[in-house]
């Protein structure tokens, strides 16, 4: 399974850039494999992302903004959903991955199952 993060390399918005860096930095720091998919430089990536963000996750007007996160082709969420999962020590579950042994998330899951 590959985590795909759809980003815009040439975004003029500092808020979008910050959110993208936050997601990518977290994945790198936790050694979670991922692919960056640039929607600014590749029309196919932009089209695929727009078509595969579920209707109920789209903004009321306009297109979904990066970063958008997928596990293979399964939509996992946007930055706000990622941030909430991180705050709740549930990023691996959010991404559709198994938490590594010894991680805070694995400890929380073990306590819930006990």
UniProtKB/Swiss-Prot annotation:
Entry annotated with the keyword Cell membrane: yes
Main location: cytoplasm
GO molecular function, one term: protein-RNA adaptor activity
Associated pathology: Promotes breast cancer progression by enhancing the interaction between E3 ligase STUB1 and PFN1, thereby promoting proteasomal degradation of PFN1 and subsequent activation of downstream signaling pathways including PI3K/AKT, NF-kB and WNT. Promotes autophagy presumably by stabilizing the ubuiquitin-like protein ATG12. Enhances mRNA translation of E3 ligase STUB1 and the autophagy-related protein PIK3C3. Promotes activation and phosphorylation of ERBB2 at 'Tyr-877' and 'Tyr-1196', and prolongs localization of ERBB2 to the cell membrane.
Span list, region Required for interaction with PFN1, HER2, and ATG12: 54-71
CDD domains: GRX_SH3BGR (cd03030)
Expression sites (tissue/organ): Ubiquitous.
Domain topic, free-text comment: The SH3-binding motif is buried in the tertiary structure, and it is therefore unclear whether it directly mediates protein-binding.
Matching Pfam families: SH3BGR
Membrane found in the keyword field: yes
Localization terms from the record: Cytoplasm, Cytosol; Cell membrane
Record-linked PANTHER family: ADAPTER SH3BGRL, SH3 DOMAIN-BINDING GLUTAMIC ACID-RICH-LIKE PROTEIN
Superkingdom of the organism of origin: Eukaryota
Protein family per UniProt: Belongs to the SH3BGR family.
Biological processes, Gene Ontology terms: positive regulation of cytoplasmic translational initiation; proteasome-mediated ubiquitin-dependent protein catabolic process
Placement of sequence motif SH3-binding: 61-67
Reported function: Appears to function as an adapter protein that bridges proteins together or proteins with mRNAs. May function as a ubiquitin ligase-substrate adapter. Additionally, associates with translating cytoplasmic ribosomes and may promote the expression of specific mRNAs.
GO cellular component, one term: extracellular exosome
Region (Required for interaction with HER2): 13-50
Subunit architecture: Monomer. Interacts with PFN1/Profilin-1. Interacts with ERBB2. Interacts with ATG12. Interacts with BECN1. Interacts with translating ribosomes.
Protein name: Adapter SH3BGRL
Keywords assigned: Cell membrane, Cytoplasm, Membrane, SH3-binding
């Amino acid at each position: 399974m590959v985590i795909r993060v759809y980003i815009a390399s040439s975004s003029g918005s500092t808020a979008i850039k910050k959110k993208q860096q936050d997601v990518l930095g977290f994945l790198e720091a936790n050694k979670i494999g991922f692919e960056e998919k640039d929607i600014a430089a590749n029309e196919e990536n932009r089209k695929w992302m727009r078509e595969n963000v579920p209707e109920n996750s789209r903004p009321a007007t306009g297109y979904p903004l990066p970063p958008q996160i997928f596990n293979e082709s399964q939509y996992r969420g946007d930055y706000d959903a990622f941030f909430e999962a991180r705050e709740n020590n549930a990023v691996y579950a959010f991404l559709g991955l198994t938490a590594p042994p010894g991680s805070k998330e694995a400890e929380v899951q073990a306590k819930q199952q006990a």
